[in-house]
Amino acid sequence: MLNKYNNLFDGSLGDFNVPPIKLEVKPNTEPVHSRPFPVPHIHRQTLYKEIQRMVALGILEKASCSAWASPTFIIPKPNGTVRMVSDFRKLNANLVRKPYPIPKISGIMQELEGFQHATALDLNMGYYTIRLDPGSQDMCTIITPWGKYKYLRLPMGIMCAPDIFQEKMSNLM
């Protein structure tokens, strides 16, 4: 199976075959524009490299101008890599959430009872496989010391991202 579908396991970014997602904001919402967070000198190059990696993968794109801007920072991980985090709290306060039921682990484990084998798969960059429509890309603009970048894919930190992702996964199954 790995040999037959080796392109699915190469570590690259996949593309969920669904129409681009449109994020909905509450009526009369004005764009939210924040200043960039200061980045400690020790982390500047690391953050810049992570942004460039995400641009190369097609997750981010340099934004020429946007009325929206959410600040971004990095959190070092124990394995030496970093997680880029965008502070979407102000955007989230203006988004309309459409809750989708997210299954509880305990329920899933009960369904597996009696099986002799189980497999765990990690969907590499799962949210990033879902494209955003142009208006949502604009709303998901981040600001850094090097300018603005817009997310082309569903970013982590958007309050409705888990609902959107779970709905797509449930429909896939």
Residue ranges and their predicted role:
Residues 6-32, 75-85, 112, 121-152, ...:
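Reverse-transcriptase-like RNA-dependent polymerase core
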Residues 99-103, 136:
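Short, conserved loop/turn and helix-capping segments at secondary-structure boundaries
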Residues 37, 154-155:
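Short strand-loop junctions, especially beta-strand C-caps/beta-turns
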Residues 1-100, 147:
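Reverse-transcribing Pol proteins
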Residues 46, 50, 104-107, 164-171:
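Well-ordered alpha-helical segments embedded in enzymatic catalytic cores
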Residues 68, 113-114:
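Residue-level preference for short coil/turn positions at secondary-structure junctions
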